[in-house]
Amino acid sequence: MKAEIITVGDELLTGNTVDSNSAFIASKLTEKGYLVRRITTVGDDVEEIKSIILEALDRKPDVLVISGGLGPTHDDVTMLAVSKALNRELELCEECLERIRKFYVELHKKGLIDDPELNEARKKMAYLPKGATPLQNTEGAAPGAFIEHEGIKIFVLPGMPREMKAMLLNEVLPRLGERTFIQKKYLAEITDESKLAPILSEAIRKFNVRIHSSPKGFGKYIGIIIFGEDEEIIEKVIEFMQSRGISFKEGW
């Protein structure tokens, strides 16, 4: 099962904002058993976002998660780009509009904004691509969207980390179903990654697991993560590597 992630925002490309969203999304998709094959960042330009989406769809991932660009300002154009990429008109979601209205009324009651009225900028957030299922935003105004397109599950989420995380956990992950997936982290006592490489390759072929290695500077340990669906198989991988002379301790 493969997945791709697209994060949207000029601020990500200028370095003014660190893209923590893609790391969080990738970690949760990995826990669900998805292999994240690509993470792409694009600026707030309709045609560029559309192009990146079309490129991702051509690779036929099982899941595509897009984050950012759903707010009320002029440069929040992600939903428009999605509609263009999928050739679906934007339609007003009345349910979303009512939630947005209530959101601003509550902010006004708390004294956080001066005007609770639904101006055109706020109404813009209630438009979703035709056929999309709205995803509830419990932490903000802009709804997300879930679209099934040619067998690909597409999720469009806000860029604010608090809003994105809540929507991912509450709306996205439940739609991906339940799948047992395990990742175990170890430190392999070996100083040369090149000597470890053939052993890892043999283990991957033999046990049908995914293994990621990461050198820890020039110390005597190399970090290893083993991904699989069966804990017994992962233990057999460790036993196999130990039989090849590699010592382990748990950690990372």
UniProtKB/Swiss-Prot annotation:
Pfam name, any one: MoCF_biosynth
Entries under InterPro entries matching the protein: CinA (IPR050101), CinA_Arc (IPR023055), MoaB/Mog-like_dom_sf (IPR036425), MoaB/Mog_dom (IPR001453)
Family in the record: Belongs to the CinA family.
HAMAP family reported for this sequence: CinA_A (MF_00226_A)
Record PANTHER family: NICOTINAMIDE-NUCLEOTIDE AMIDOHYDROLASE PNCC (PTHR13939), NMN AMIDOHYDROLASE-LIKE PROTEIN YFAY (PTHR13939:SF0)
Name of the protein described by the UniProt record: Protein PYRAB15930
